[in-house]
């Protein structure tokens, strides 16, 4: 991979082999630093991953960040009814960042104060039958612009 300028990274997911906080931490502990992490805020939150702990301990391994939010009421239904991942997505588990229950301060702090140079991918896994995709994309873009402009301003103030 090095020869081609590529880096291997693991993308954790709900209802997959590495899901919960202790599983993600064990995976990262048992693999070398040559294996990066695609940190997904929605999957992390829904699986009980502590974003502050993961970014503090393994921030140097984060190569890519996916930003999406979680609807608390749907997460509760998913857990109560033991819904599959596909059923959870169809039920509207994920939403545009800033419209759910995730506290993004550990991620915005990590991005502002670390040397992270990777991509931020804003996701809005919406059912297009329930919401016009362009409306979700517009809200997601505004959220990212507002959130990370504030994060950048905080970094400049601290220096």
Task: Put a short name on every predicted segment.
Residues 21-35, 39, 45-159:
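Histidine-acidic metal/acid-base catalytic patches
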Residues 1:
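Electropositive, glycine- and tryptophan-enriched low-complexity nucleic-acid-binding patches
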């Amino acid at each position: 991979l090095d020869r081609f300028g590529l880096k291997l990274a693991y993308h954790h997911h709900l209802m997959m082999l590495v899901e919960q906080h202790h599983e993600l931490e064990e995976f990262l502990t048992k693999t070398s630093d040559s294996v990066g992490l695609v940190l997904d805020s929605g999957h992390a939150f829904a699986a009980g991953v502590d974003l502050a702990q993961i970014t503090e301990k393994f921030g140097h391994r984060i190569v890519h960040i996916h930003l999406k939010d979680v609807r608390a009421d749907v997460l509760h239904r998913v857990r109560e009814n033991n819904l599959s991942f596909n059923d959870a997505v169809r039920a509207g588990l994920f939403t545009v960042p800033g419209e759910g229950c995730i506290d993004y301060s550990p991620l915005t702090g990590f991005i502002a104060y670390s040397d992270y140079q990777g991509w931020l991918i804003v996701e809005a896994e919406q059912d297009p039958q329930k919401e016009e995709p362009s409306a979700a994309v517009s809200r997601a873009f505004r959220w990212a612009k507002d959130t990370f402009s504030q994060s950048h301003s905080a970094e400049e103030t601290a220096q």
